Amino acid sequence: MNQSQTWSNGTFSSPDGNIGDTNDNPKVFDANLSNFTGCDSAAILRYEPPSSFTVSSKLEILGRETLDGTLASNRSQTFRIFTTSSSVAAYTVTNSQGEDFDAAPSNWSNGAITAMEIEGNTLNTTLVGFRVDGELLTDPGTLDTTAKDIDSLIDTPTNYTADSGNNGGNYCTLNPLESALTGINDGNLNSGSSGSAGWKICTSTMAVSSGKYYWEGFTDTTASPSQGWQWGFCNVTPSSLTNPYGTGKWSYQHNVVYSQSSSGSNVSVTAGANDLLAYALDMDAGTCKLYVNNSLVHTFTGISGTVTPFVGSYNSPTVTVNFGQRPFAYTPPTGHVSLCTQNLANPTIANGSTAFDIKTYTGNGSSYGNSQTISGLSFNPDFLWIKCRSNSSDHHLADTVNGINKNLESNSTIGNQTNNNNGYISATTSDGFTVVYGGLDGLQTNDNSKTYVAWAWDAGASTASNTDGSITTNVRASQTNGFSIATYTGNGSANQTLGHGLGASPSFVLIKDRSSSQNWAVLHTSAGTLGTLDGGTNYKLLELNANAAARDASYNTIWHPTNTTVKIGEGASSAHWTNKSGDNYVMYAWTPVEGYSAFGSYEGDNSTDGPFVYTGFRPRWVLIKNIDSSSQEWVILDAERNTFNVTGKVLYANTAGAEADLGAINDRHIDILSNGFKVNRGDPLNQSATHVFACFASHPFKTARAR
């Protein structure tokens, strides 16, 4: 009801002759009475809903008398209720010693209500409101006292669709974890000021790549050009939190719009203090409409990627945002919905454990052949990565295409090992795998009383030959899960291609020579580009088994990922990492799946309060590497070994070391959140450098719940 009813501009008078001043122009009914002003003396405010309505149980009258902002006593207010039977019921309510009004008349005439009037009987300001069957009547169309002041908000971890149009779920808010503004308040819906003569911005907790969304914002009483504010949206990882302009940012200030540039364009409408701004974003069309006080001002075009709302302040102005948790002031354009988890697109993978899962277990082997079956996975695993937590031991990587009883080690250059003397995997099951004590010991997989973690991926149901590239590959791929395993034999030639079967360009690729001792070649598309090579983008090379920084153009080993292939095999000795003639190789390739996997980068700041990294889901497994340093490890963290924050129990992919708890060492850790992760202090996670990451979800943000 409260989103569709509006006030009329009908009967309104005031004995002081200043019709429309602050005291004479109350246009909101609200329960938070301390925020509102009302009628002076005989001023009358009339409310007419778009259509008549009936009251099934109770009509409540709310009010408060004030005098210059302080409570007055023994003041009265007259309320009139008009019905379809043409009858009028009038009620006069008097408070006592400045108390709030709270009356529930039950003797109005039969018939549906067509109008309500409020008349002030004293020369004192009155704060007033009606509540019908427990629902507050609100004027969503006025700006001086508006929905921004409503403190009863719709926000719940339970997603549901409501007949009223105000769906249930977690609503977007400003994100204090990705903000240069330090005074965010009002439930993270008010930006707070920058506190200095310089731009500072704050992003939001939700980002979208598809769909149609609407949100509003109110400028404050000091929102002037010299005391600046910014209102806009930007790419999910903004280049700067102290600059509201530039690539990947679209915004509005005063009477200028900015589209990915610091040079703006003037528009016909000037927004100042106490104005209502709104955006109607259509990611499917790549457009966004900007409204000021419900008038269309500008349409942004050419929007792509994943974007999130942001606000900015230069010195003192603030903006109060409303993503739908409060009633909107205006009706959103057709098809546009609030930024609420219920309204987000349904994820391809609703539960991350159906594509990636983690098991921890304790070994039980003490002699050769002792085995145990680990169960409880949500699928039959195709790729298993096992590490002993309690002791120093090599990593154990095995897959069903290479052969599950054969393994590689992420921390070494060694090739295939069959039935490893330090333990191996003998088989997989519909929900797990069997680990065996080896000829020497079981330290890699099943040594008595040792603790282990196993990370498991699902690569689909079948393996087939793939001839998309110049070298034939044997591929097992799940396009739904964005993961494939491929084996091939090198031919020693330059500029070769490998089919990966993903149907989308991979962002993260591991290649290892199975026949001889060679480094692990790693392609990560956020590690930095080196121009073009043989018609494709060349990326810096990384090594999984080493703590080296990213390699330069002399290591042209793996590059140019496309929807069907990647290129390999050009360069000096590094060519042997991916294409030595006659050697057998395995390739693991991932492409991002929205709500399930993410591969990106962040810039560390070497502070105790590091960057927030948006993933669009609650991470379950995170791999991080500082690519600028030659002495920083590949860090693995997960939510199975760390069941609550802080998340600081680490294993290093490039070393054999036992698990270490960095959370207990100078507070070096991350916090796992419902929409990403927050990096904290120091090395190896937050140096002043570029860090790349690979991340897999427990649940997408739509269902991850606020944490």
For the regions a protein language model found, what residue spans apply to each?
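Extracellular low-complexity Ser/Thr/Asn/Gly-rich intrinsically disordered segments
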Residues: M1-N2, T6, T11-S13, V55, ...
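Disordered, acidic Ser/Thr/Pro-rich linker "stalks" and the adjacent N-terminal cap
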Residues: M1-P50, L67-S73, N95-S96, L174-S179, ...
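Hydrophobic beta-strand residues in large extracellular and virion-surface proteins
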Residues: W7-F12, L45-P49, L59-I61, F79-I81, ...
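Generic beta-strand hydrophobic packing signal
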Residues: G10, P15, S57-L62, M116, ...
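Aromatic, loop-rich ligand-recognition surfaces of beta-strand-rich domains
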Residues: N23-A89, D102-T138
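Residue-level detector of beta-propeller blades
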Residues: S87-A89, S96, L296
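Beta-sandwich interaction modules
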Residues: T94-A115, G120-T122, G369-G376, D609-V613
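Surface-exposed molecular-recognition determinants
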Residues: T138-K212, F218-S224, V236-R707
